[in-house]
């Protein structure tokens, strides 16, 4: 009887691991850096604040799902003028978190995030 229970627990653990792997595949860490016309700065900043953490002027970062990432890209494209503005997006898998080192003043310390 104990063997059957152990096998059952192992099957459940395997399913949980598969679900976790699927969820990780659906998520990523992004850093977005933008240089847009002054007339669009507040609009793009307000939009990105809804989805990511503000780091400093023109820089946002955070963990998002693939679906959220696509919504963010679509929102950015609706705001910017592609002939005049520039947005750079760095994507990282969740199992590879970039190391961040701050030189000088930290504009938005992580412990300020509620």
From Swiss-Prot:
Keyword match Cell cycle: no
First-level EC class: hydrolase
Binding site for Mg(2+): 35
One example of a Gene Ontology biological process annotation: maintenance of CRISPR repeat elements
CDD domains in the cross-refs: Cas2_I_II_III
Molecular function terms, GO-annotated: metal ion binding; RNA endonuclease activity
The organism's place on the tree of life at top rank: Archaea
Cofactor(s) listed: Mg(2+)
Pfam families referenced in this protein's UniProt entry, alphabetically: CRISPR_Cas2 (PF09827)
Record's keyword annotation contains Cell membrane: no
Keywords carried by this UniProt record: Antiviral defense, Endonuclease, Hydrolase, Magnesium, Metal-binding, Nuclease
Enzyme Commission no: 3.1.-.-
Subunit structure: Homodimer, forms a heterotetramer with a Cas1 homodimer.
Reported function: CRISPR (clustered regularly interspaced short palindromic repeat), is an adaptive immune system that provides protection against mobile genetic elements (viruses, transposable elements and conjugative plasmids). CRISPR clusters contain sequences complementary to antecedent mobile elements and target invading nucleic acids. CRISPR clusters are transcribed and processed into CRISPR RNA (crRNA). Functions as a ssRNA-specific endoribonuclease. Involved in the integration of spacer DNA into the CRISPR cassette.
Entry similarity comment: Belongs to the CRISPR-associated endoribonuclease Cas2 protein family.
Name recorded for this polypeptide: CRISPR-associated endoribonuclease Cas2
Lineage: Archaea, Methanobacteriati, Methanobacteriota, Methanomada group, Methanococci
